[in-house]
């Protein structure tokens, strides 16, 4: 646990990898799947995995994947969203790119049906999984030719790209003219010193999962606009992300706690619970939001 805390303070790429390798198992056993996003919750949502799949579908529609040909998914994790998208948009070719080699290897195993996955296997039966390619690379130096893709997406991963502006520069380079960069990420919405202890406390679980730069909304928008992109749309969905997730955990804590403490120390579950409460409060008071941003290369 000390190492996890140190990772949140140092916040370099290796720390982000170690952090996600440590916490992804926790997310998997509590959600029942390999999607590593917060999820989108509405009145019909019954559980975290359903919320995650809903957000993945929503993000694909927001990115206009029905008209896309070549998609670069940066920070793809276990590629669960990519497997979902390839089943929904069969003409799509997806390059899954991640600096985390361990997660890429697991994603390749899922792709070749060598391991079980509650979402992936359903998608694989209906899709051309050979249109998914896995590349071990950093987000700021993409091993991709100039003007070779029509979509670059970062699905709840751009908050870890350091420096963020270099990711935007690389996205501009590899995108065709009028190509889209599409981002889903948590942002800070109220002015505050992002490194201050009060904000660290207010962020709750985001202090762990948001292990890189804590970007303010205006910084994200200005960086995108000053590097050759025109922002086409922004959706603010934090009210359907943070609070409902925390409420689900509160309502089902006894069951989820029994699952977690089989594999993790009891104090970690306590930290998780208190962090979710802090995250809910931060969202309620307007300190944080969750955005979907779409911008076109000009």
Question: What are the language-model segments listed below?
Answer:
Residues 205-287:
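Substrate-binding/catalytic lobe of Class I Rossmann-like enzymes that use SAM or dcSAM, i.e.
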Residues 18-62:
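Class I SAM-dependent transferase core
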């Amino acid at each position: 646990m000390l190492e996890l805390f140190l990772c949140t303070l140092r916040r370099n790429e290796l720390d982000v990898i170690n952090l996600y390798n440590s916490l992804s198992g926790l997310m998997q056993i509590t959600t029942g799947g390999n999607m590593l996003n917060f999820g989108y919750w509405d009145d019909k949502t019954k559980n975290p995995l359903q919320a995650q799949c809903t957000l993945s579908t929503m993000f694909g529609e927001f990115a206009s994947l029905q008209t896309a040909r070549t998609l670069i998914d940066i920070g793809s994790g276990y590629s669960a969203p990519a497997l979902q998208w390839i089943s929904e948009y069969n003409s799509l070719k997806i390059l899954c790119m991640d600096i985390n080699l361990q997660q890429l290897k697991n994603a390749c195993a899922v792709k070749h049906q060598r391991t079980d996955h509650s979402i992936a296997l359903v998608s694989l039966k209906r899709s051309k999984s050979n249109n998914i390619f896995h590349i071990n690379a950093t987000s700021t130096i993409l091993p991709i030719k100039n003007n070779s893709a029509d979509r670059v997406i970062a699905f709840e991963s751009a908050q870890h790209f350091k420096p963020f502006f270099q990711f935007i520069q690389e996205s501009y380079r590899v995108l065709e003219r009028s190509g889209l960069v599409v981002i889903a990420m948590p942002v800070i919405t109220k002015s505050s010193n992002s490194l201050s202890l009060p904000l660290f406390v207010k962020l709750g679980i985001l202090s762990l999962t948001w292990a890189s730069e804590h970007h303010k909304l205006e910084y994200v928008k200005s960086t995108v606009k000053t590097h050759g992109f025109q922002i086409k749309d922004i959706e603010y969905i934090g009210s359907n992300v943070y609070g409902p997730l925390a409420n689900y955990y509160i309502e089902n804590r006894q069951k989820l706690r029994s699952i977690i403490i089989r594999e993790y120390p009891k104090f970690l579950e306590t930290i998780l619970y208190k962090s979710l409460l802090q995250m809910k409060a931060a969202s309620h008071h307007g300190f944080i939001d969750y955005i979907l941003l779409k911008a076109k290369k000009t």
